[in-house]
Amino acid sequence: MIITTTPTVENRQIIEYKGLVFGEVVAGANIIRDFFASITDMIGGRSGVYEDKLNVARQEALVELQKQARNIGANAVIGVSIQYQSMGKKDMFIIVATGTAVVIG
């Protein structure tokens, strides 16, 4: 399945628009545990533990987006956008991937 942030797929014609699809993932972060686990990463100015959590959650959101698109008969998702938002007491976050499911030829 083609997943793209662009509104079209180069050299491919959109045959049918199937509708808006979403992939949503809520993840948690234990700040105290993660802080001690990543103290070395933070000395370098980056937190590898949090980056890894974001990467995994983003991939899960994209997998969910693809599942929704397949379930409605699409073979591509165009105009994909990914949003990040903290929730609650900042120890939870949500990643939402959205796009338009289409059939391309």
UniProtKB/Swiss-Prot annotation:
User: PANTHER family given for it?
Assistant: UPF0145 PROTEIN YBJQ (PTHR34068:SF1)
Protein name per Swiss-Prot or TrEMBL: UPF0145 protein HD_1349
| Taxonomic source organism | Haemophilus ducreyi (strain 35000HP / ATCC 700724)
InterPro entries tied to this protein: UPF0145_dom_sf (IPR035439), UPF0145_YbjQ-like (IPR002765)
The entry's family comment says:
Belongs to the UPF0145 family.
